[in-house]
Amino acid sequence: MLRSSLESCTSTVISGRAGAGKTALATDFARICGRSVAWYKVDAADLELRVFFEYLVASIRQERPGFNEQNIMALAGAAKSDHILRLAEIFVYELLEGEGNPLLIVIEDLHQVCDAEWLVPFLCRFLPLLPRDVHVLITSRTLPPAPLWRMRSKQTLEVIDEATLAFTPEEAVELFETYGLSSEQARHAFERTHGRAAALATQAVAQNKSRTAHKNRPNDPVERRLADQDRAL
């Protein structure tokens, strides 16, 4: 689905709760997409327009050193609502003018600044204008606001929600089999985690570690006690 979105849309939003597998999916795709990757992990302190763009621009300049930040940061520093659309247009212009490989811009945890008044107007102007060699991939714990959601009908935005991210029972069995675990163990883990990717993977790793430790434990009671004492030291 991400590959299809990369080819047909300008942007993708991966939405789901903590542990749904958003970051894992974004990381795997960034590794195989064949593009340079600018990665910005948003923090709650980035709510201020100027701060957000400082980090976003810095991530892009790591991959495109010639990316011109001067006009962007001048507008971002002014922090006026009537500058937002102009800011989006200048940002796109600099992406068009800049030289470099095709680019994937990953904005992780955008929900951290979802209450910012400038965010939706900026994205609604910015995402549809992106050049073909730039794709924006957003991860968020919240679904896109209504104005962004409507962009799906214009083939500008692809949304991958938690239901799409979740493992099916069959996929859970396949995952557990790679750790040498049974389908019964996979079924119980699936029921506990509701198929959430990170939680399911954690269960598989933990059960495999427990199985390996039990398998390697000495059979002789004396040896077993000595081994337990060694681990306690």
State each model region's role.
Residues 1-18, 24, 28-29:
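Walker A/P-loop-proximal flanking segment of P-loop NTPase domains
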Residues 3-7, 31-34, 84-165, 180:
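A conserved switch/coupling segment of P-loop NTPase cores
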Residues 14-16, 39-41, 106-109, 137-140, ...:
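Short beta-strand segments
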Residues 20, 25-102, 112-114:
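Conserved phosphate-binding/catalytic loops and adjacent sensor/switch elements of nucleotide-binding enzymes
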Residues 32, 59-66, 98, 113, ...:
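Phosphate/oxyanion-binding loops and surfaces in catalytic or ligand/nucleic-acid-binding neighborhoods
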Residues 152-153, 157-163, 168, 182-233:
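Loop-to-helix "switch" segment enriched in basic
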Residues 166-177:
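Conserved AAA+ ATPase core "coupling" helix
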